Design a protein with these regions (language model features):
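Transmembrane beta-strands of outer-membrane beta-barrel pores
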Residues: 36-42, 77-81, 116-122, 150, ...
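Repeated loop/turn-to-beta-strand initiation elements of outer-membrane beta-barrel proteins
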Residues: 68-73, 107-110, 152-158
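Residues that define the transmembrane beta-barrel architecture of outer-membrane proteins
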Residues: 28-30, 51-55, 90-94, 136-142, ...
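Outer-membrane beta-barrel biogenesis signature
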Residues: 3-5, 11-35, 149-151, 155-156
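Membrane-embedded beta-strand positions of outer-membrane beta-barrel proteins
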Residues: 32-36, 73, 98-100, 110-114, ...
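Short glycine/proline- and aromatic-enriched beta-strand/turn motifs that initiate or cap beta-hairpins
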Residues: 20-80, 180, 186-190
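Outer-membrane beta-barrel translocator domains and adjoining extracellular loop/strand segments
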Residues: 43-50, 83-91, 122-130, 170-177
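Predominantly the C-terminal beta-signal and adjacent terminal strand-loop region
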Residues: 25, 132, 142-190
């Protein structure tokens, strides 16, 4: 009876170790991710403060240095309604950042980065005949986000993300800065 019990325990331990090794993520090599969701922008213009809720995008491209750490180029797009000109129009208050993403657990990750903050036209709301609308402005930008992978299979993962970014730019009317928070659903390939 003792040998049968010992044999059963050894089989269970072996099966458990095998199942755990199959569930561990295989993050290596190049990383690509894209997410979309909703963003809330708090922007302080020289003449007024503005709050907007609109569409958000995020993209990232990089390389896994090890199964827990990736170095990335990360883009954050947060659309807002600019109304300090002759017509209301949509613009992006986001940026492009060099960032590091670290997996605290096999599903939960944190990301931080610094780069170029932007105030740029949104391609689907440009009137090319108005040259003011086609101007890009840049400055300092910071990004921080957290995410949780809700589904993973092989080198594909689906995650939920919360992002905050700070941008400061010099517009023709003066220095403009603000925070944008976003909640996103993302797809990632490792």
């Amino acid at each position: 009876m003792k040998s049968l019990t010992l044999f059963a325990i050894c089989c269970l331990i072996s099966l458990s170790a095998s199942a755990q090794s199959q569930n561990e993520p295989t993050r290596k090599g190049f990383v690509f991710g894209f997410s979309s969701g909703i963003a809330n922008s708090h922007i302080k213009f020289p003449s007024k403060k503005q709050n907007n809720t609109n569409f958000a995008l995020n993209w990232k491209v990089g390389y896994m240095l090890n199964p827990k750490l990736a170095l990335l180029i990360n883009g954050a797009v947060s659309v807002y309604e600019y109304d300090l000109s002759d017509r209301k129009r949509l613009r992006d208050f986001g940026g492009v950042f060099t960032s590091a993403q670290y997996f605290m657990t096999d599903k939960f990750w944190v990301l931080g980065g610094v780069g170029i903050g932007t105030d740029a036209p949104v391609f689907y709301d440009i009137k090319p005949e108005n040259t003011v609308e086609t101007k890009y402005y840049s400055g300092l930008g910071l990004v921080s986000s957290v995410g949780y992978e809700i589904y993973r299979k092989n080198n594909f993962a689906l995650d939920l993300q919360a992002r905050i970014n700070y941008t400061t730019v010099n517009l023709p009317l003066g220095k403009t800065n603000g925070f944008t928070t976003a909640f996103l659903v993302g797809i990632n390939f490792y």
